[in-house]
Amino acid sequence: MTTTTMAGTPVAPAAAKPWYKVLYVQVLIAIVLGAIVGWLWPTVATNDWIKALGDGFIKLIKMVIAPIIFCTVVSGIAHIQDAKKVGRIGVKALVYFEVVSTFALVIGLIIGNLVRPGAGFGNAAANEAAVATYAKQAAGQKSVDFVLHIIPDTVVGAFAQGEILQVLLFSVLFGFAIMSLGERGHTIRSFIDDAAHAVFGVISIVMRAAPIGAFGAMAYTIGKFGTGAILNLIGLIATFYVTAALFVFVVLGIIARLAGFSIFKFLAYIKDELLIVLGTSSSESALPSLMEKLERLGCSKSVVGLVVPTGYSFNLDGTNIYMTLATLFIAQALGFDLSFGQQLTILVVAMLTSKGASGITGAGFITLAATLAVVDPRLVPGMAIVLGIDKFMSECRALTNLCGNGVACVIVAWWEGELDRDKLNAGLSRQIDPTDMETAITTD
């Protein structure tokens, strides 16, 4: 196996870029500057144009998510000659998702019971109108509605509205259809492969705006909510961040070690995506570039195309930790002593409601409303307690979700025997520049 660029030339070790041209450095500086502007000049930071910088960047990313998923999934399936292989990858991915998601939920419950961050909490000023908005959205969420929602009314509508699961369903069916064509499908397979490279080219252009988007999003957040907004609830925030770190470095670290790679080197490899997510609070904003990097890291196109998009709805580890911790915190703050049976109910309910939480900012808060309503409707008003700091917790949710899905893809590829060890080692040892958008492909 040799590693080449799209032009067919060997990939040399990446030359070091000047520090100020490195994307993650630019994003990190932008986040710090945004926080300073939001703190010192909140009136300026909450201007609609500042907010538009962050919102605009997220919209640019979301603009290409549907075509990226379509091209990668269709291409991955269409190039597989064995239909059973697709099903095998899907089953392995779902098994992994459920096992690891359960670990995330259990860790959240254990830490919440040990630390009890909501114990002795004073009465919070309820923002009933804002809570009612989330509760109303959650009220209509039923399992049957979630299943039916996966099926689009029209294919065009699925793409136009950016519904990931709907696009994924159509892409899988379309990929199988091309597979069944055999040699007759060669032309359309080649066209979709070329289209995928073109869309990734769009991503490389859009990513240049990441520092601007991160600056706007962070400035607006600090300017609107202020540093004082988190002081009363710093215990919950700290508990959540520590729990998420424990999950990433211990649970995912052990899983990564079993597969033969270091979680620390992997996180260093995806540092650009982590910082983009930190600035935008949306794990979805890093989906296209994450898929590109995982292919360069040695995961096969078929595994990346199936596992990553599916994981954004079925493998939200950060959201799982958040829901168990936040539910316990609200119950403790309101003086409810949840029984062991009720806490088991949290596990079961959260396992279901989290499946509808996409990588969009704020989706975790809506699923929290759904979980509280099922566990005990009296807990729903307590959402007002965490409403003010949800924005500060959403960064950690999104970061953990991103880490979980990245590791999941590598693990499933390793489990399926579709992981190129040479490319994995080269990528994690930085012999291949992960920021180079000239896609490294594997040739026999």
Swiss-Prot record:
Signal peptide: none annotated. Its main location: membrane. It holds the Pfam family SDF. The chain crosses the membrane at residues 22-42, 60-80, 95-115, 162-182, 198-218, 236-256, 321-341, 346-366, 399-419. It comes from the Bacteria. GO terms for cellular component: plasma membrane. Keywords: Cell inner membrane, Cell membrane, Membrane, Symport, Transmembrane, Transmembrane helix, Transport. One of its GO terms (molecular function) is fumarate transmembrane transporter activity. It is a multi-pass membrane protein. One of its GO terms (biological process) is L-aspartate transmembrane transport. InterPro entries: C4_dicarb_transport (IPR023954), Na-dicarboxylate_symporter (IPR001991), Na-dicarboxylate_symporter_CS (IPR018107), Na:dicarbo_symporter_sf (IPR036458). It is found in: Cell inner membrane. PANTHER family: AEROBIC C4-DICARBOXYLATE TRANSPORT PROTEIN, PROTON/GLUTAMATE-ASPARTATE SYMPORTER. NCBIfam families: PRK01663.1. Belongs to the dicarboxylate/amino acid:cation symporter (DAACS) (TC 2.A.23) family. Responsible for the transport of dicarboxylates such as succinate, fumarate, and malate from the periplasm across the membrane. This is C4-dicarboxylate transport protein 3. The lineage of its organism: Bacteria, Pseudomonadati, Pseudomonadota, Alphaproteobacteria, Hyphomicrobiales. The gene is dctA3.
